[in-house]
């Protein structure tokens, strides 16, 4: 603060001091929405062996429901992870959600994708649905549900003004909060590398990625190769070189 920095923190254990962060709010394109589905599923299954078929099915239904929430007439209020979890809990055999999907699907392809999903064999459908629901288990924590229900931090401010942003998680619960970290870092990297958000006079950004071994950031090697062109510096902290694998 004394050096002229604005200081913020993402802190799920102290909501009064934390910024609010809704990952669905930052997703405006179908690929960005599907990437959220991918991160949800891959974070929940990291370190476990699950048939890719079930993972793909879980990502599919999550992606469909995210698109519907984002297309809701009052998306600012309803498009968040807690409501995504609510939809999965109300899924049943799929038919209870059909009116919602029919009313909010952004296009015919999304609606027909949902109809195709619920027309699968019951065992297949329920296994994929269960995998999707498990990926949102952390939303049972009311503090995480509340923190991710709104957005209060503008990524663009990092390029405009001197800013220090801390992700604050208890050391003994880093894995528990890894979903928040994975979503936040992924979306922040995408913003920082976006040509539309960068100008030659933009402020540089320095990332210190502590406990990197707990993170699951899609296409991170590709991100590394393009950071220098956008005046981004990365420092990665690992407990062991085996975490690079």
Regions found by a protein language model. Name each.
Residues 227-245:
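Sensor-1/coupling segment of RecA-like P-loop NTPase cores
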